[in-house]
């Protein structure tokens, strides 16, 4: 383990099993995720959530999200995810050979899973209004937000750079988009499915008795959208590549899922 100074901040590099244990299992007195990540994530997610709040508040917000990750909801999501994947394969240009009768097709699996992750997440966790508005303009906002995750923003998050201007504009527009959904639901103009994360968050209160406000919900929804995209895409891609290397177990795994 060693420490060096970068742009006036001390940076500690922790290597090996002991280093991993310090990073992932360290006490709050030893490590602070908020101090490490807030300059990178707060401009993207928005204020008042995740690493822009004390750890105790973050733990409560994690509890709010966990309430929406119920077994009941997951059972509902299975059919929705299946429908999205089938529709994607039947209509996306990447699978044109299959649509024309070919028995196989070659695709960039990571690109495909990146798209599928957005489609399935918006259909399930994000809610029907998000899925219905998932067009090119929404994709552009997502791209501009995602571009805000650049290394320089760890230490200098507000440099007058074009990608930061686009990030800030996209954050405001995305936040207002979610606020509009929440407002219509509270006014009874639209109904959620009851199984998405917006529905779950709208019912939550902090331990002190304060209800979570609509802006916090909007920013938590942005965090959910952004935070899970890369890991889910990478994990899905890895799983598919492993299956491709072991074709003899594909049918066995499929039958297992059918039984479940």
Give the location of each predicted region.
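N-terminal membrane-proximal hinge/A-helix region immediately C-terminal to the signal-anchor transmembrane segment
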Residues: 1-47, 51-60, 79-87, 170-173
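A glycine-/small-polar-enriched, mobile loop at the entrance of the PLP active site in fold-type I
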Residues: 49, 71, 75
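Cytochrome P450 heme-thiolate monooxygenase catalytic core
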Residues: 33-39, 75-236, 252-255
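A compact, surface-exposed functional segment
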Residues: 241-260
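Short hydrophobic alpha-helical segments that form membrane-spanning helices or hydrophobic packing faces
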Residues: 5, 23-24, 232-241
């Amino acid at each position: 383990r060693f420490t060096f100074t970068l742009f006036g901040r001390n940076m500690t590099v922790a290597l090996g099993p002991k280093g991993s244990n310090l990073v992932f299992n360290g006490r709050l007195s030893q490590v602070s995720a908020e101090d490490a990540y807030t300059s990178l994530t707060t401009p993207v997610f928005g204020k008042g959530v995740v690493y822009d709040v004390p750890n105790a508040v973050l733990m409560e917000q994690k509890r709010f999200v966990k309430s929406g990750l119920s077994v009941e909801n997951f059972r509902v999501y299975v059919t929705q995810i299946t429908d999205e994947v089938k529709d994607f394969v039947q209509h996306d240009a990447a699978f044109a050979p299959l649509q024309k009768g070919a028995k196989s097709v070659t695709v960039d699996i990571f690109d495909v899973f990146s798209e599928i992750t957005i489609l399935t997440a918006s259909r399930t966790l994000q809610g029907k209004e998000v899925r219905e508005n998932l067009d090119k303009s929404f994709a552009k906002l997502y791209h501009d937000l995602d571009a805000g995750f650049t290394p320089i923003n760890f230490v200098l998050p507000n440099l007058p750079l074009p990608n930061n201007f686009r990030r800030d504009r996209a954050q405001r527009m995305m936040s207002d988009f979610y606020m509009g959904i929440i407002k219509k639901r509270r006014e009874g103009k639209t109904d959620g499915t009851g199984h998405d994360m917006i529905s779950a968050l709208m019912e939550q209160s902090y331990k002190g008795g304060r209800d979570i406000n609509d802006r916090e919900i909007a920013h938590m929804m942005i965090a959910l959208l952004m935070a899970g995209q890369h890991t889910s895409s990478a994990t899905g891609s890895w799983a598919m590549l492993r299956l491709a290397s072991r074709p003899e177990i594909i049918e066995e795994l499929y039958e297992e899922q059918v039984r479940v």
